[in-house]
């Protein structure tokens, strides 16, 4: 079994056309300039179900997963990506009250499935700026649902 590289990883976006239904087509490439995608591998919280008769250890069952407050992809800032993200944030003002979320589809070359995350895009701020550095910053998404690994959806652009 061969290992896989991060070379060629891509992030696609698509809005739900029906509230609560992950799109299966219509994804478009967000950016070729993403430099870091954070982990999104959260274990469920443990629910204590220890009976009073237990004398040795606490018993737990899986509870809800906390997807956190922020999913921040880092990228090289450029006008195209900044405009695209700002458009997603603007669309959120209309779609989120209707229960329609933005979906990210993250593809890794050589992996048959893609990873899906839905949420609300957040307006960009000013990134850190320092001498002799690339202008990079974060594209923030407030997670709504962890779609997990699933069949790749069709996309409009590669």
State where each predicted segment sits:
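Short beta-strand and beta-hairpin "edge-sheet" elements
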Residues: 105-151
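Residue-level detection of beta-strand scaffold positions
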Residues: 71, 75, 100-102, 137-139
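Intrinsically disordered, low-complexity terminal/linker regions enriched in Pro/Ser/Gly
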Residues: 153-158
């Amino acid at each position: 079994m061969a290992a896989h590289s991060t070379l060629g990883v891509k992030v696609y976006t698509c809005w739900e056309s029906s509230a609560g239904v992950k799109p299966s087509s219509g994804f478009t490439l967000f950016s070729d300039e993403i430099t870091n995608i954070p982990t999104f591998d959260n274990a469920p919280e443990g629910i204590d179900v220890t009976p009073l008769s237990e004398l040795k250890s606490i018993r737990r069952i899986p509870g809800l997963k906390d997807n956190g407050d922020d999913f921040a992809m880092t990228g090289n800032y450029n006008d195209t990506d900044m405009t695209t993200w700002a458009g997603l944030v603007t669309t959120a003002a209309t779609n989120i009250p209707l229960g329609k979320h933005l979906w990210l589809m993250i593809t890794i070359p050589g992996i048959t499935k893609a990873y899906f995350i839905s949420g609300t895009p957040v307006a960009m701020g000013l990134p850190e700026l320092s001498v002799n550095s690339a202008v990079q910053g974060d594209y923030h998404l407030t997670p709504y649902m962890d779609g997990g690994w699933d069949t790749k959806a069709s996309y409009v652009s590669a």
